[in-house]
Amino acid sequence: GKFTETRHITVEVYNRYNDGGSDPTSSVYAQYIKQGMLDKYNVDVELVSVGRWTEVDDLNNLLATGDAPDVCVTYSYPTIQTFAGMDGIIDLNPLLTEYKDLLPDLWALLGDYNIYYDQDPETGSVWAIEAVLAESARINTFIRKDWLDKLGLKLPTTEEEFHNCLIAFRDNAELLLGADAAKMVPFSISTDIGWRADLLNVSKVPEDVSDETLYVYGYDDRHLLYPNYKEGIRVLNQWYNEGLIWKDFALYTDASVEDDMMKSGFVGAFIHNWDYPYRNGEDSIQANLTRANGADAGFIAVDCFQNDAGITRKYLADRID
């Protein structure tokens, strides 16, 4: 139904502060939501901007000053538990039970699995509802297709072939980069090794690993405790000592320096989010590469890492987000 008197609620929305991005509280999507809620339910929605990368601190400050939005979003469940212990948020379980019949779209989208994912098994309390993980593609391996073509190499399909490509990039730095040969980075990585080398590392997990083992250690989306995982780290150490990995990766905790190297055309390959070279439109890695190095320059996704059964396994996250 529609309220006879206009109601007002505040709702958190992430601000990623992307260069050239729109204000998340007044974007076209924000206007669509606000106008739709007002027209259909007579609810005035006020969006509150919270920094995506500073969300925990921002929410703590808003809660401390009494200005926290009515509806908050966070990836930090410990923060939710802290708020619950301070009586800063309400138990949703009674409301979910009472109003379930009025929320068919919510149940159709999330189902009991997501809605009750965080339910306290002892008290029955529900302090947060898990969103749907709409995109599960996760991570891909990317390599400079134009460099492969220039060196007469095929797209790598195995770890050995990928390794050989990195060696070729290193050994032909002057041909590929000319005066910038000293800036050659055959394979780039960050301090988040568990994410940025995941496909290589989990390829060392035996095919006969039990479902029990995957469940027990599956809480960690970096898979650090999966069986044989350390063998992937051994490979990375070998590559580093061979001069194939960005030697200064451990000095930087944000992505800007590494992204700039990719945009400038100094990086031959990397593992990252499934669409990483192509996101951010005209400021994407791919767009910058083609502008600086010609239409043929750019990265292409490849699958190179098979397990002991010759199968490419990608251990994806649960359907919560």
Describe each region flagged by the PLM.
Residues 1-321:
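Extracytoplasmic/secretory soluble proteins
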